Amino acid sequence: MRKTILLALFLALTGGARAQKAAGQQEARMRRGLATITVEAAKAHIYFLANDLLKGRKAGEEGSQLAAEYILSRMREQGVPPLLQDYGQSFEAVSKATLGRPRWMVEPDSVLPVKSGRYQRLALRNILGAIRGQRPDEYIVVGAHLDHEGMNPLLEGDPIYNGADDNASGVSAVLQIMKAFAESAVKPLRTVVFAFWDGEEEGLLGSRYFTETFPNIDRVKGYINFDMIGRDHKPEIPEYMVYFYTGSHPEYADWLRADLRRYALALQPDYRPWDYPVGGSDNGSFARKGVPLVWFHT
């Protein structure tokens, strides 16, 4: 995972405050926040989340619950308040029993009209914190899914899918950006939501539930997704990264280009505008609601 990616995003999210007070105390606060983004911190988060103790963080199982508690403790430690009344957004998913992979369903009230038969239930929980902005009722959501594939007892040797890249790397990124905001005390232009989704591997369940139930979804001005940023797609170009964004919002590419120049950040983004950006990660839940998005991926 590249520290430079996190620096670029933090600088972009603080852009509204920077435009108003470009020098002096504001700049010093930003640099204090940037100093908290370190390789050591990234490794510490990833090593814990991908540890065998969490048994692959399967949605609805003990490992993913431990991951959620770890994230929650980091939020409290940094003094980041919850977005809603509580940090946890609990919900249920239901799937009819099947020999193959289950197809999970979520409903806004978690009360599902189902026909008779055998069903499986998952108790899931998103973790949501927020730093209020100058426009408190407008939102930018920065998110990563916390779950992974769990275990496969049929595998010889090590049966655990640890999920260091997918997606301990993304969770680590969002945790570090959150800490940088908290340490800087910079007030962003819009409220920044730090979201950690449960159940992504089962069908984007956590982000789908949020986008269906958050009462101010029409005031979400953008979603920034971190999923699988821990491996080199092009090892011969270590600065390479894929930068998906909503094609109808070219400013999402412009701000990254501007900060790369201004701060001499060593990244080589592969800019990929999408005319209809859905995709196979949590960005899809927001795209279906018409929310413009960015997806960092390596």
PLM features per residue range, with description:
Residues 45-50, 89, 126-130, 139-143, ...:
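Structural recognition of the beta-strand scaffold that forms the well-ordered cores
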Residues 1-24:
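Bacterial Sec-dependent N-terminal signal peptides
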Residues 197-295:
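Metal-dependent peptidase/peptidase-like ectodomains
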Residues 57-130:
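A non-catalytic alpha/beta surface segment that caps or lines the substrate-entry region
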Residues 127-129, 142-148, 152-203:
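Alpha-helical metal-binding/catalytic segments enriched in His/Glu/Asp
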Residues 19-82, 131-132:
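N-terminal hydrophobic or amphipathic helices/low-complexity stretches enriched
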